[in-house]
Amino acid sequence: MKTFVAKPETVKREWYVVDAADKTLGRLATEIASRLRGKHKPEYTPHVDTGDYIVVINAEKVVVTGNKAKGKMYYSHTGYPGGLKETNFEKLQAFKPEMIIEKAVKGMLPKGPLGRDMFRKMKVFAGPEHKHAAQQPQVLDI
């Protein structure tokens, strides 16, 4: 019996919607990253994007444990000398809650072109409404 290798043109992708309300950030991000990679499928192949599409709603209601709301820092750089900017979880959640989940999941995906393709299949929305109803996503309980 030969080893099965998935081919990009034969991969069947599903759409799922995940409600992030009152979910722990890390536990949510690991499950999303695993689904984006396709590791839950029997035809998973490391060098082929076999993952599904994930729509995350209620990103503004995701939680972290302990004192991380004030202590967890996010850094960005403008590209200019002295341009290191930092903000904590609380401020970023108030300003741009989608970025929290995006940054957590992106760090768990492979680096390079394949990882970028996987990351593009995730759509994050701050509130309960999303614009992908036409794809008829199934509810994924995490």
Curated annotation (Swiss-Prot):
Q: Does the keyword Chloroplast apply?
A: no
Cited CDD domains: Ribosomal_L13
**Entry keyword set:** Ribonucleoprotein, Ribosomal protein
A GO biological-process term: translation
Q: PROSITE patterns recorded for this chain?
A: RIBOSOMAL_L13
Q: Name one GO cellular component term.
A: cytosolic large ribosomal subunit
Family matches, as Pfam families: Ribosomal_L13
Give the source's domain of life in one word. Bacteria
GO molecular function of the protein, one example?
Answer: structural constituent of ribosome
Role description: This protein is one of the early assembly proteins of the 50S ribosomal subunit, although it is not seen to bind rRNA by itself. It is important during the early stages of 50S assembly.
What is its quaternary makeup?
A: Part of the 50S ribosomal subunit.
Question: According to its UniProt record, which protein family does this protein belong to?
Answer: Belongs to the universal ribosomal protein uL13 family.
- The molecule here is called Large ribosomal subunit protein uL13
Taxonomic lineage: Bacteria, Pseudomonadati, Pseudomonadota, Gammaproteobacteria, Alteromonadales
